[in-house]
Regions:
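Metalloprotease/metallohydrolase-associated module, dominated by Zn2+-dependent proteases
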Residues: 2-37, 89-270
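Small-residue-rich helix-interface/hinge motifs
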Residues: 32-102
Length: 273
């Protein structure tokens, strides 16, 4: 048995987590820029339908900001001001201001929408859209490709079994699009995540160098590896949620972007006549 198995599992699970977060971030911004924005422009007589755009992003924005609030409460950071949905002229639609925190807690607060949005998408799929036998909270995907393939198959199966004649189905898809937009971090959140991530990487590299230089054999320590294995299991559950969220956002992007672009093109063509 590999004496560093726990740390190896943790390193792999962490890599999967980062890969999924990057994928969610990319899909979320594609959904916003090439889906929700063109769709709002297509159904407008004045260039851009602001009320429709706000309606599309409302649920997701509320979940995004609530995730920050809950993270502040759980980490003991005092919240100064909360606006769950308050569109401003500069493009900001919601915010949470809090006291200054250390890099670790600041990073956890910035990460909160990933978890909050993924949990919201999970709840949506379990309780609003047609039921599925796959439960991400009880699954532990080890392989990234197989895990994402299973999550995508779950989402596609749900859509295929949906009754498009029921308002509940369209309401569920609307929430899926909105939540997909809001799962990704904002620019300020991303700044905190990058700063915190670089600090963590620097700390890990320092420990590895010190361990190798002084032959401390920390990588083979049983207690450290057991703790790392437990953290890896927790990350695998998180990755299951992130995979489901990523698959849902990817599907939403694949559906709404062509519709939005086509609608916008038709509107421009009709307006030019």
């Amino acid at each position: 048995m590999d004496p560093a198995a726990g740390l190896t599992a943790l390193a792999y699970a962490s890599g999967v987590t980062v890969a999924l977060m990057v994928a969610i971030y990319v899909c979320s911004h594609l959904l916003l820029r090439y889906g929700l924005v063109p769709l709002s422009a297509a159904f407008s007589f004045s260039g851009f339908n602001v009320p429709l755009f706000y309606l599309l992003i409302l649920p997701g924005t509320v979940v995004h900001e609530l995730s920050h609030v809950l993270a502040c409460l759980m980490t003991g950071v005092h919240v100064r001001d909360v606006r769950l949905f308050s569109p401003q002229a500069n493009g900001v639609v919601g915010w949470v201001t809090h006291d200054t925190a250390d890099p670790l807690r600041r990073g956890l607060i910035a990460l909160a929408p990933f978890l909050g949005g993924s949990v919201a998408i999970y709840a949506l799929i379990r309780f609003v859209l047609p039921p599925t036998e796959v439960d991400p909270l009880t699954s532990q995907p080890v392989d990234l490709a197989l895990g994402f393939k299973a999550a995508a198959a779950t989402i596609v199966g749900i859509v295929r079994s949906s009754n498009l004649h029921e308002p509940k189905t369209w309401f569920g898809l609307y929430l899926l699009f909105s939540l997909g937009y809001a799962v990704a971090p904002s620019r300020q959140d991303l700044h905190h995540l990058v700063a915190g991530g670089l600090m963590v990487i620097g700390l890990i590299m320092s420990v590895i160098v010190i361990d190798g230089w002084f032959q401390l054999r920390l990588m083979q320590n049983g207690l450290i590896n057991n703790a790392a294995a437990n953290v890896a299991v927790a990350l695998q559950h998180l990755n299951a949620l992130l995979m489901l969220a990523c698959a849902g956002i990817a599907l939403g992007t694949a559906v709404i972007v062509p519709v939005a672009v086509l609608s916008y093109w038709l509107r421009r063509s009709l307006a030019a006549r």
